[in-house]
């Protein structure tokens, strides 16, 4: 056992971790359909969330300040020592998001409803707040209760039960 072999084994294992059998994936393949509420959620998601959560993994792979209240955790700023990176955290993939609670880098939200409530009315104006969360000087992302409910229904279509229940993992 050497560090190189451990790295190679871990790399091979991680290459096996492919989640691509969710309802969303089946819709893309033409073997399933969204409900009307899921379709409405997808539309709302594309309009209000996809600037950060895009692509097949539903992440832009960047680091952003998403308007959480400031804590001692400087996020990426602790690594880069760049003040512009303070309180910026990795934009996560939303694949299997319904199974990955608690949410945010510090686990402060226990439900997707609370996450969407944060973006709708809880965004804090901090020095490094991402500009997407401060359009025209207004904080947050305007979301109706129906949009939030439908977005959550859409997000649930990103869950791949086959992957989650795979006995190999």
Which ranges hold each PLM region?
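Periplasmic c-type cytochrome electron-transfer domains
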Residues: 1-169
């Amino acid at each position: 056992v050497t560090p190189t072999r451990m790295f190679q084994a871990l790399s091979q294992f991680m290459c096996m971790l492919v989640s691509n059998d969710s309802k969303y994936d089946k819709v893309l393949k033409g073997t399933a359909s969204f409900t009307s509420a899921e379709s409405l959620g997808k539309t709302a998601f594309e309009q209000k969330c996809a600037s950060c959560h895009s692509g097949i993994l539903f992440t832009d792979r960047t680091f952003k300040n998403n308007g959480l209240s400031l804590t001692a955790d400087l996020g990426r700023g602790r690594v880069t020592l760049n003040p512009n990176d303070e309180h910026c955290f990795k934009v996560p993939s939303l694949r299997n998001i319904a199974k990955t609670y608690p949410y945010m880098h510090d686990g402060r939200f226990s439900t997707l409803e609370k996450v969407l409530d944060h973006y709708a009315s809880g965004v804090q104006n901090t020095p490094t707040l991402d500009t997407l969360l401060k359009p025209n000087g207004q904080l947050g992302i305007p979301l109706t209760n129906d949009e939030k409910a439908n977005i959550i229904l859409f997000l649930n279509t990103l869950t791949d039960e086959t992957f989650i229940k795979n006995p190999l993992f």
